[in-house]
């Protein structure tokens, strides 16, 4: 089973972030400044040995890859930020490409969203807008990506480089752009592209461009949250305290939203794929209060033992129900959202050990 972990590159300084958020800002600032939002909530999460690394250090990436390989992760899916030719946080991915000594599969997810001040809960001022341009812009973007597609380590499906679109529903020119990208791929000597979408806000069955996608990723817990939120919205504040125990939701001490880890995973394991295009997802934990403070959302009831149990079940379902040899995992290093596999002071290597044991127990360790 090939487990591909989503990879956040925001662990180094760059001018735009310092302009918007202050000198020296990286994702680690959110992580360090995190605080509990209710009694028993574990924050901040601290990397083992205070390893607040810099992704521009070659040694950091080599350490990450060594760790991922040792514990059974197949590859990384790098988030890529492209705004009409303007790029942010491109250096870690470019350094990976340049250093051929790093023997590890990787692919790219274009995180095509506006950047706003929503993190800070100040307002939704747009810091940089996501636009899509014209055909010339699509070609510039493809030509930038082509150097990665041609790398022998790049993840491919039947020779076709995998490219993931984070928010396919946000692209007004989706059909025209994807048709052109496929054309550019053929002109470049590639056998084609393997195009996937990530967020559950898009459904290939309901869009005229849906036929251009080879696969859809059940990005978790994003996908299952849609149904959970519907349940929450049906509960009025008036009767919340009566039904909270039955829904496994702790009483709110603030405006954060809490979800049961067990309930979330049980819903995931009960899902049926939309059709044969779907690739299953998994997640280790969820807690975005380091970014959103008391306005965030989080899971409660997590343990590495539970993660192992649920991941084992999802690996079996990937083979038996989805008939796929891939699972996309949230995440390798989303410390600001609770989705990280890297060792921390609280659990040490427990998350990594749980993942490897799940692969071993299911006979799927490659």
Q: Could you describe each region identified by the protein language model?
A:
Residues 1-366:
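Glycan-processing catalytic domains of CAZymes
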């Amino acid at each position: 089973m090939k487990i591909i972990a989503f990879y956040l590159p925001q662990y180094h300084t760059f001018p735009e972030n310092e302009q918007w958020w202050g000198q020296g800002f990286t994702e680690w600032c959110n992580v360090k400044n995190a605080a509990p939002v209710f009694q028993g909530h574990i924050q901040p999460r601290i990397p083992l040995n205070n390893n607040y690394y810099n992704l521009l250090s070659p040694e950091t990436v080599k350490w990450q890859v060594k760790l991922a390989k040792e514990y059974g992760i197949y590859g990384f899916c790098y988030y890529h930020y492209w705004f009409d030719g303007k790029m942010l946080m491109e250096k870690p991915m470019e350094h990976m490409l340049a250093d051929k000594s790093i023997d590890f599969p990787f692919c790219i997810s274009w995180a095509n969203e506006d950047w706003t001040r929503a993190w800070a809960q100040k307002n939704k001022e747009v810091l940089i807008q996501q636009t899509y341009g014209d055909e010339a812009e699509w070609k510039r973007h493809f030509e930038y990506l082509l150097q990665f597609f041609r790398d022998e380590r790049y993840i491919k499906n039947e020779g076709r480089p995998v490219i993931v679109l984070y928010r396919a529903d946000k692209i007004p020119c989706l059909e025209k752009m994807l048709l052109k990208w496929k054309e550019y791929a053929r002109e470049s000597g590639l056998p084609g592209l393997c195009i996937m979408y990530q967020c559950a806000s898009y459904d290939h069955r309901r869009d005229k461009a849906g036929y251009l996608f080879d696969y859809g990723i059940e990005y978790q817990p994003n996908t299952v949250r849609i149904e959970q939120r519907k349940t929450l919205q049906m509960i009025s504040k008036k009767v919340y305290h009566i039904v909270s125990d039955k829904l496994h939701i702790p009483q709110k001490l603030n405006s954060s939203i809490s979800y049961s880890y067990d309930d979330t995973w049980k819903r995931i394991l009960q899902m049926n794929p939309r059709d044969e295009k779907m690739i299953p997802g998994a997640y280790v934990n969820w807690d975005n209060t380091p970014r959103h403070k008391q306005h965030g959302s989080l899971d409660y009831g997590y343990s590495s033992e539970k993660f192992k149990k649920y991941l084992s079940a999802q690996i079996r379902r990937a083979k038996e129900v989805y008939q796929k040899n891939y699972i996309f995992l949230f995440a390798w290093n989303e410390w600001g959202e609770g989705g990280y596999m890297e060792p921390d002071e609280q659990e040490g290597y427990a998350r990594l050990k749980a993942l490897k044991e799940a692969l071993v127990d299911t006979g799927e360790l490659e």
